[in-house]
Regions:
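Conserved lysine of the Walker
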Residues: 253
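Generic anion/oxyanion-binding catalytic loop in active/binding sites
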Residues: 28, 41
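Short helix-coil-helix linker/hinge
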Residues: 30-35
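A noncatalytic interaction/capping subdomain that flanks phosphate/NTP-handling catalytic cores
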Residues: 7-21, 25, 36-37, 55, ...
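Short capping segments at the starts of secondary-structure elements
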Residues: 42-51
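Hydrophobic positions on the alpha1 helix immediately C-terminal to the Walker A/P-loop
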Residues: 256
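Eukaryotic partner-binding/assembly regions in large regulatory complexes
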Residues: 1-6
Length: 411
């Protein structure tokens, strides 16, 4: 616990006054007695209830057997201050018990909140409690707080649009969602390791989905820090690889992947969003639960085959792009956080690496079968060429090995 900066003790009396956002929130000041004043002064630095109890017991020389009652009194006083908004719990101290653990794209998440608070969309990504406890240390602690925040956190606004406002403040980031009516605010630590979502209990299916959607920017921020980036795209499995199809809103990426399903019986992977990372020398696509309205997702990880950028046209045409054009177009389809120059550079460098090492196609096309046939033909040709090149490389390696071995024997 520590004091909310919008409350200040002024002058020599025992009155505490509000200012700034607290005035706007119509929060009143308060008068403190001697004991409350001493606790207030202690809370000028972050304190636990246990630490406050020990310090007050030492100051008033309270016997050990009476310190249990003292702890209850201090806990009650702190709860009053929390309700009043005069103190706040620092990020990193979840309230309640762990309601479940999730494992998404290698990121381990512990969720705290009311019973049954975890959205059903995460069911396929739940972890069991077994295994090595050391390996179960969470990468993200997510607190789902079914209440209003004690006060609204102001800060420097980084982005603001119809759907999301992101501001930076002393402990990290604040998210606000104008279109998600039962989500009040999200407070997230600067390193993405802890987030607290203030929300109202959902009263319909739309509001239940809102909580699931509100968690997405928290996850994508942490994923970005781990070298994984999200591309707005539909994906399918072909030649044992994930192929991503992306284009402007309304382009018909789902329609295009449906053509593949109809013509070539290719399995879908995700209908709207794909998370790409790199493991060793390979780019991979991770299964994630967010998939737009398609309800198409997977928990599996697949090697990335390539990216197909789609554009409406009266006929089918594969257009050649420069490396710079590929990088720019891939980055434009990414939805990993671009809130700061540093984050934007991360997106750019990753898009550049993908464009350099994996095929990026630009297909101007119709919604006819010929669109899928055109790009499939090109993919097959390139995959055969790549495989032939790899086979030749292996043959050359095998030829060199005996020669090198012979030279060693002679020496």
């Amino acid at each position: 616990m520590n004091l909310n900066e919008m409350y200040q003790k002024m002058g020599i009396d025992n009155d505490v006054y509000t200012y700034g956002q607290k005035i706007a929130d119509q929060k009143r000041g308060m008068e403190l007695n001697e004991t409350a004043l001493r606790l207030w002064e202690m809370l000028e630095q972050p304190q636990t209830v246990e630490a406050l109890t020990d310090k007050m017991a030492a100051y008033y020389e309270i016997p050990k057997e009476e310190q249990g009652e003292l702890a209850k009194d201090i806990e009650a006083f702190v709860q009053e201050l929390l309700v009043f908004g005069a103190v706040r719990r620092e990020l990193g101290c979840p309230k309640g018990s762990c309601e479940g653990r999730l494992h998404i794209a290698g990121i381990k998440i512990e969720v705290y909140g009311e019973k049954g608070c975890i959205p059903k969309q995460f069911d396929a990504f739940r972890m069991t409690d077994g295994g090595n406890p050391e390996k179960a240390i969470p990468d993200l602690i997510l607190e789902l707080a079914e209440r209003l925040p004690g006060s609204r956190q102001n800060g420097t606004i980084l982005i603001r649009n119809r759907d999301l406002t992101v501001a930076i403040w002393e402990e990290g980031y604040v998210f606000r969602f104008d279109t998600l009516k039962n989500i009040y605010e999200i407070w997230m630590k600067e390193d993405g390791s802890y987030a607290r979502i203030y929300y109202r209990c959902p009263i319909n299916e739309e509001e239940q989905d809102s909580l699931f959607l509100a968690i997405r920017p928290v996850f994508l921020f942490l994923a970005q820090r781990r070298g994984m980036f999200a591309l707005h795209s539909a994906s399918l499995l072909y030649l044992e690889k994930a192929w991503l199809f992306s284009g402007p809103s309304g382009m018909g990426k789902s329609t295009h992947t449906a053509l593949w399903k109809k013509l070539f019986a290719t399995p879908f992977l995700n209908g709207d969003l794909n998370l790409i990372g790199k493991e060793g020398e390979k780019f991979v696509v991770y299964g994630i639960p967010w998939c737009g309205t398609s309800k198409i997702f997977t928990t599996e990880k697949k090697e990335l085959g390539g990216i197909v950028l789609l554009e409406k046209a009266p006929s089918e045409e594969l257009v050649s792009l420069t490396e710079e054009q590929k990088t720019l177009r891939v980055m434009q389809r990414m939805i990993s956080p671009p809130w700061t120059a540093e984050l934007m550079v991360k997106n750019l460098k990753f898009a550049e690496a993908v464009a350099k090492e994996k095929p990026v196609y630009f297909l101007r096309c119709t919604k006819n079968d010929t669109a899928a046939e055109t790009i499939r033909r090109q993919i097959e040709e390139d995959e055969k060429r790549q495989k032939a090149g790899s086979d030749d490389c292996m043959k050359n390696m095998k030829k060199r090995i005996p020669k090198e071995q012979a030279q060693e024997d002679e020496s």
